[in-house]
Amino acid sequence: MSLFKFAAFVLGTAGSVAGHGYVTKIDVDGTTYGGYLVDTYSYEPDPPKLIAWSTTATDTGYVSPSAYGTSDIVCHRGAEPGALSAETLPGGSVTLYWNTWPTDHHGPVITYLANCNGDCASVDKSTLKFFKIDAGGLVDNSAVPGTWATDELIAADFSRTVTIPSDIASGNYVLRHEIIALHSAGNKDGAQNYPQCINLKITGSGTAAPTGTLGTELYKNTDAGIGVNIWNALSSYAIPGPALYTSGSDSNTATSGASPPSTNFSPTTTAAAATTTLSTVVTSAQSTSATVVAEQTSVSYSQTPWPSSTATEATSASSSAGGSNNGHTGTHDEAGHCPAHTGKKRSRLNRRRMASCSSRTQS
């Protein structure tokens, strides 16, 4: 093994055990609720009651493709339902805030809903059938590895806003929000899923009941959007999972990995400069999310909901296993495409990092 490949392997292994991220708070139509702080609440004898589901992923790690057929993929490892629910209406807005996200963990950000058909606090997660309501994938392919929905999330202070479909029937629902990191997906079992779940009570006069897919059937490790090498130039990317539901039609009948929307590009020679607000170049069916919140507010350990007037600037949460991500190093593919790079927590996607990476790869 060459020194270059060995160094990339060592750095990649270090990145795989370091902390990544999780949802720390949720804003539902202007009311703020606490997320499940896995590196804190897991060690408390009486954690607060939340709308967020608990998990046992104290390493803030991921679910790998080899576990797609297990219950861990539904709402993360060892997930249990939250005791509370946040009320919203069809057309309502939900913003989910992550504590942090490594700049090199590029990939799609996907959100689903599933009707609990009863009380979500006692639902059997293995029975939940999810339909996709929001998805972002490859935004710009002008320079490897491209600009992704995760980069938009970082630029929006680690948040993404989704809109509840305007025709959804009233009821109790689980909202499943997920990042799929693809920095190592060129390797077998290399994709990393980070699902997070919350409970919603949707009221109103909607009547739509979209067809859903069991959590254990959302993805296959052979899906084109799962086994992909982002360190090679991509002309398109198919977001994994069932089709995106659009109000007025039940479009959620496609099988895993076979459904649009995908992102298609024409080759260009000039890369547009990245800004703090990124425009998603996708098909019209995918542009469903509302404008993301530009400033992150506080992370609190109090009971929910939180009064929004008490919000203060957030500090990054540290992983119980890996600590701070302020210099997080990711894993690249074993063929040696671009050595691992680091980035500050609030990086605005400096394009020069990949130009430098490309020049080193060619040397």
Curated annotation (Swiss-Prot):
Location within or outside the cell: Secreted
InterPro entries recorded: AA9, AA9_LPMO
The protein, known as: AA9 family lytic polysaccharide monooxygenase I
Keywords attached to this entry: Carbohydrate metabolism, Cellulose degradation, Copper, Disulfide bond, Metal-binding, Monooxygenase, Oxidoreductase, Polysaccharide degradation, Secreted, Signal
Record-listed E.C. numbers: 1.14.99.56
Disordered as annotated region, ranges: 248-270, 298-363
Biotech use: Lignocellulose is the most abundant polymeric composite on Earth and is a recalcitrant but promising renewable substrate for industrial biotechnology applications. Together with cellobiose dehydrogenases (CDHs) an enzymatic system capable of oxidative cellulose cleavage is formed, which increases the efficiency of cellulases and put LPMOs at focus of biofuel research.
Cystine crosslinks: C75-C197, C116-C120
GO molecular-function term, one example from the UniProt record: monooxygenase activity
Ligand binding (Cu(2+)): H20, H105, Y194
Keyword Coiled coil attributed: no
Key word Oxidoreductase present: yes
Ranges that cross the membrane: none
Expression triggers: The promoter contains the consensus sequence for xlnR binding sites (5'-GGCTAA/G-3'). The degenerate binding motif 5'-SYGGRG-3' that binds to creA involved in carbon catabolite repression is also present in the promoter.
Source organism per UniProt: Emericella nidulans (strain FGSC A4 / ATCC 38163 / CBS 112.46 / NRRL 194 / M139)
Low complexity: bias regions: 258-270, 308-329
EC class of the enzyme, as a word: oxidoreductase
Functional description taken from the UniProt entry: Lytic polysaccharide monooxygenase (LPMO) that depolymerizes crystalline and amorphous polysaccharides via the oxidation of scissile alpha- or beta-(1-4)-glycosidic bonds, yielding C1 or C4 oxidation products. Catalysis by LPMOs requires the reduction of the active-site copper from Cu(II) to Cu(I) by a reducing agent and H(2)O(2) or O(2) as a cosubstrate.
Record text on cofactor binding: Binds 1 copper ion per subunit.
Catalysed reactions, semicolon-separated: [(1->4)-beta-D-glucosyl]n+m + reduced acceptor + O2 = 4-dehydro-beta-D-glucosyl-[(1->4)-beta-D-glucosyl]n-1 + [(1->4)-beta-D-glucosyl]m + acceptor + H2O
GO cellular component: extracellular region
Residues at which O2 binds: H183, Q192
